[in-house]
Regions:
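Acidic, polar-rich low-complexity tracts and alpha-helical solenoid repeat scaffolds
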Residues: 1-153
Length: 153
């Protein structure tokens, strides 16, 4: 199942980012950075993804690049930087498909690592009210209720 999901994700990445980038320069750079990430070279991958944002800032791949950057920063325990990357998705790509993930991952950082349950609750709430179709909807509800103090979960 995981392989099928990976293949579908790759197909959508190529399809979504081939229209405006007919030479696929941004997509090629993204795939090279993603390969470094797969090879566990997180610091190198992070630098490459950041360079993509500089070189292809107006490219449709920018939101997915920001998501990768945020996840790497979280893995490297750069929590404030990760939140900043996720916020950029929320603010600059508000109509994109990664907003729910950015909200959820930010909430998780606030809850698990920065000990700020109020900010986490506010972000979980945004997922609950604005992204009912998100795969993070149910978990956001659960975490929100736990932070609110519900005992009948």
């Amino acid at each position: 199942m995981l392989i099928a999901n990976d293949a579908l994700e790759l197909f959508l990445l190529i399809q979504d980012n081939s229209v405006e980038d007919s030479l696929r320069k941004a997509l090629t750079a993204f795939s090279k950075a993603d390969l470094k990430l797969y090879q566990k070279k997180k610091t190198e991958a992070l630098q490459d993804f950041k360079q993509i944002l500089i070189d292809y800032k107006d490219d449709p791949i920018a939101d997915e690049t920001l998501l990768k950057i945020g996840k790497i920063q979280q893995d490297l325990k750069q929590y404030n930087e990760a939140i900043s990357s996720f916020n950029e998705i929320i603010e600059k790509h508000a109509e994109g498909v990664f907003v729910d993930e950015a909200l959820y991952f930010s909430a998780e950082i606030y809850r698990r690592f920065l000990d700020n349950p109020e900010k986490a609750k506010a972000l979980y709430e945004k997922v609950i009210f604005n992204h009912q179709d998100s795969i993070y909807f149910t978990e956001s509800q659960r975490q929100y209720r736990l932070l609110r103090g519900d005992t009948n979960i």
